[in-house]
Swiss-Prot record:
Entry keywords, A to Z: Cytoplasm, Endonuclease, Hydrolase, Metal-binding, Nuclease, tRNA processing, Zinc
InterPro entries xref list: RNP4, Rpr2/Snm1/Rpp21
Function: Part of ribonuclease P, a protein complex that generates mature tRNA molecules by cleaving their 5'-ends.
EC identifiers of the protein: 3.1.26.5
Name of the molecule in the record: Ribonuclease P protein component 4
Quaternary data: Consists of a catalytic RNA component and at least 4-5 protein subunits.
Length: 107
């Protein structure tokens, strides 16, 4: 297999992996209300896909997953979002850890 063909195949595999991660994320959002354990499983599958293909999870998905216990975070249910000193502070209610994401203040 030539170098170009391998590169095209890798790009195709990564595109499929990203599609699957987004689909699992949408399923996790919709299933959380009735089956929170299913949404935890979907998060686990997202992580497995990203590790298997050695690619990062998209930022929008990554911000909704606890970095410590890998719980699916839903604002108001199992996560608390606060704005503090230029950061969004997300507190996981399951493990008690906090994640901080910077944001730009409007001038």
């Amino acid at each position: 297999m030539s170098r170009i063909a391998r590169k095209q195949q890798k790009n195709l595999i990564q595109a499929i992996a990203i599609q699957r991660m987004w689909r699992l994320f949408e399923l996790a959002k919709s299933e959380y209300a009735e089956h929170p354990d299913r949404s935890e499983r979907y998060v686990q599958l997202i992580r497995n896909i990203s590790m298997r293909n050695r690619m990062s999870i998209p930022r929008e998905i990554k911000n909704r997953i606890c970095k410590h216990c890998y719980a699916f975070l839903v604002p108001g249910n199992n996560a608390r979002y606060r704005l503090k000193d230029g950061y969004i502070v997300v507190s996981c209610q399951r493990c008690g850890k906090e994640m901080r994401y910077p944001y730009k203040k409007l001038k």
